[in-house]
């Protein structure tokens, strides 16, 4: 029995029961190889499509045209603004957050000291750890 006849018999559930063990195993093997083969071919096809899309969408390096007269190089950039400016902004943001949490105006608060916490775990992370430890016993 050739493979096409075997696969025709294999397509009908009633005729599968009448097949001999060798023919049944051959049909199973052909079905597995066809299924896996089609899957591998489809995945390879998708791989090439995605690779092509990545190549099309990738940014191409911009070509810089050299001018005859070289532009003078700029001097060193000015130093960034002092950190005190950023600290004032940070205090203002913290004051606004505390005021929003307390439901009051930021002008009603006096912030005397702002220090960084040693534990950098977010509050939800600490709450999860406490919850796990509480339910452990």
UniProtKB/Swiss-Prot annotation:
Which GO cellular component does the record give, naming just one?
plasma membrane
Q: Broadest EC class?
A: translocase
One Gene Ontology biological process = sodium ion export across plasma membrane
Q: What reactions does this protein catalyze? A: (S)-methylmalonyl-CoA + Na(+)(in) + H(+)(out) = propanoyl-CoA + Na(+)(out) + CO2
- Coiled coil spans: none
Enumerate the transmembrane spans. 30-50
Pfam families attached here? OAD_gamma
EC annotation from Swiss-Prot or TrEMBL? 7.2.4.3
Look up the signal peptide feature and give its range.
none
- Is-annotated flag, keyword Transferase? no
Q: Could you tell me the membrane topology recorded for this protein?
A: Single-pass membrane protein
Cell compartment(s), UniProt: Cell membrane
Q: Which domain of life is it from?
A: Bacteria
**Protein name (Swiss-Prot/TrEMBL):** Methylmalonyl-CoA decarboxylase subunit delta
- List the keywords (alphabetical): Cell membrane, Ion transport, Membrane, Sodium, Sodium transport, Translocase, Transmembrane, Transmembrane helix, Transport
Name the source organism. Answer: Propionigenium modestum
Major localization class? membrane
Q: What does this protein do?
A: Subunit of the sodium ion pump methylmalonyl-CoA decarboxylase, which converts the chemical energy of a decarboxylation reaction into an electrochemical gradient of Na(+) ions across the cytoplasmic membrane, thereby creating a sodium ion motive force that is used for ATP synthesis. The delta subunit is required for catalytic activity as well as for the proper assembly of the individual subunits to an enzyme complex.
Assembly and binders: The methylmalonyl-CoA decarboxylase is composed of four subunits: the carboxyltransferase alpha subunit (MmdA), the tunnel beta subunit (MmdB), the biotin-containing gamma subunit (MmdC) and the delta subunit (MmdD).
* UniProt-listed InterPro entries: Na_pump_deCOase
An annotated Gene Ontology molecular function:
decarboxylation-driven active transmembrane transporter activity
What family name appears in the similarity comment?
Belongs to the OadG family.
């Amino acid at each position: 029995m050739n493979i096409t006849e075997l696969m025709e018999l294999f397509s009908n559930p009633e005729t599968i029961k009448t097949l001999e063990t060798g023919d049944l195993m051959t049909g199973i093997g052909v079905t597995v190889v066809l299924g896996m083969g089609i899957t591998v071919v489809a995945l390879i096809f998708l791989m090439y499509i995605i690779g092509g899309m990545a190549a099309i969408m990738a940014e191409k390096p911009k070509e810089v045209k050299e001018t005859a007269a070289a532009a003078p190089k700029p001097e060193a950039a000015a130093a960034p603004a002092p950190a005190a400016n950023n600290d004032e902004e940070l205090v203002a943001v913290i004051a606004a957050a505390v005021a929003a949490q307390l439901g009051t105006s930021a002008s009603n608060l006096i912030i005397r000291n702002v220090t960084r916490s040693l534990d950098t775990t977010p509050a939800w992370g600490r709450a999860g750890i406490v919850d796990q430890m509480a339910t452990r016993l």
